Amino acid sequence: GTVLPGIEVRIGDENEILVKAPTVMRGYHNKPEATAEAFTADGWFRTGDAGYITADGAIVLTDRIKDLFKTSNGKYIAPQAIESRLGEDKYIDQVAVIGDKRKYVTAIIIPAFEALKEYEKKKKIAYKSIEELVRNADIRHMIEERIEKLQKGFAGFEKIKKFTLLPNAFTMESGELTNTLKIRRSIINRRYSREIEAMYV
């Protein structure tokens, strides 16, 4: 969006949007620790949002800082931006991007099963179960090619290097989704640790 008159904006560490203005609070009453967390050392208010400023001065939000993670190479990744991009594909239903403190980015992907079954019919792929279908080499190759195209605008360190297809969707009932249908990253990391570790071998 456009910056309002009288408000200064700059981009800080981790691409955090920082603001300074007479209308911004000066701190929390009798809470010096909370105030120190909310402001930089030189008095800029931390919004908690990551983003950038365009050439014409507009602000673009990309993610919440708390949702960012850092690879072992020190690069910050905005997983939701990658998940949203991949989720645009008709063969991909859900995505959980992995990569916190790891060398590269991977993903657990839930295919859009109805679209996948149509593809399987067209290509005459024989399978006995959904588990078998997601392990099929032709299916994996097709998804891989589509991921490559979807990632074209990403920096090299943001690109998914490996992925795992799961035969079951993330659900609220299983605890893998919040009631607003956002993925619970910590639960997915724990529940699918074996599949995740296999992508880093």
Residue locations for each model-derived region?
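C-terminal boundary motif of the adenylate-forming
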Residues: 50, 89-115
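Conserved ATP-binding/catalytic segment of the ANL
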Residues: 3-71, 88
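Generic recognition of flexible, low-complexity loop/linker segments
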Residues: 6-8, 57, 83, 93-96, ...
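Conserved C-terminal "lid"/linker of ANL adenylate-forming enzymes
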Residues: 94-97, 144-201
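Conserved adenylate-forming
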Residues: 2-14, 22, 101-104, 111-123, ...
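Solvent-exposed alpha-helical segments within well-ordered globular domains of core cellular machineries
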Residues: 13-14, 33, 37, 80, ...
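Adenylate-forming
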Residues: 24, 58-87, 116-137, 156-160, ...
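Acidic/polar alpha-helix N-cap and adjacent early helical turns
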Residues: 128-140, 192-201
